[in-house]
Design a protein with these regions (language model features):
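N-terminal active-site beta-alpha-beta segment that forms phosphate/nucleotide-binding
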Residues: 2-79, 83-88
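Conserved phosphate- and dinucleotide-binding cores of soluble alpha/beta proteins
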Residues: 82-201
Length: 201
């Protein structure tokens, strides 16, 4: 997949964009960029597949609720992640026109992406890219969300059937927060990491 159109759109919207051939190359880049920092990470299968946490934790103070220390709860780790200097997240969908879409449960990830850090890194594999905003939204709701629900073991219609969002009212529903970055938010640096590999959901 060519990232030419997406990269141009993102740069016009104010983002710094870096492009990598594979996850290993991107992981090495981020590990070299970040040293002696506090780093928060949002829930992300992409980050897990990249083994990025392991590459960062030896020389940074990293908070990720998918790797809990023994003395901290998931909620405490999420709060510390949201107060960190740097934040790393993947996305649920992105349009070639530059709109970045995320769907969240507790809201820690969508809030952290939007505000509060010196810099935010958004990691995007080629499978997350759609041609339009409408298609990116459909991808986030009907592909990413059902796969995440299934991964988390919840008993929602999308997790059971695995085909689409049912806009359910289940108490286990994970789609409770929604965000779109129309452009780069003011007040923080943002770098989009584009990877020529299929990563995450």
């Amino acid at each position: 997949m060519e990232f030419t159109k997406l990269k141009t759109s993102l740069e016009c919207l104010g983002y710094t964009v870096s492009e990598f051939n594979d996850a290993e190359e991107a992981t090495k880049y981020l590990a070299n960029q970040l040293s002696d920092r506090t780093i928060g990470i949002g829930g992300s299968v992409t980050v897990e597949e990249m083994k990025l946490y392991d590459a960062l934790v030896s020389h940074n103070d990293v908070y990720w609720h998918m790797r809990l220390p023994e003395n901290m709860s998931a909620m405490e780790v999420r709060k510390r992640a949201n107060q960190s200097e740097f934040y790393i997240s993947s996305v649920n969908g992105i349009a070639e026109t530059g709109e970045i879409i995320n769907i969240d449960n507790t809201g820690n990830r969508v809030s952290a992406i939007s505000f509060g850090h010196d810099k935010v890194y958004l990691i995007i594999g080629e499978n997350k890219v759609a041609s339009s905003y409408e298609e990116a939204l459909g991808r986030a709701r009907n592909i990413a969300a059902p796969l995440n629900a299934k991964r988390l073991g919840v008993k929602t219609p999308c997790a059971i059937k695995g085909d689409k969002c049912y806009d359910c009212k289940s108490p286990q529903r994970i789609c409770r927060n929604f965000s779109v970055l129309w452009e780069k938010p003011t007040g923080s640096e943002y770098e989009v990491i584009l990877i020529h590999e299929k990563l995450g959901y």
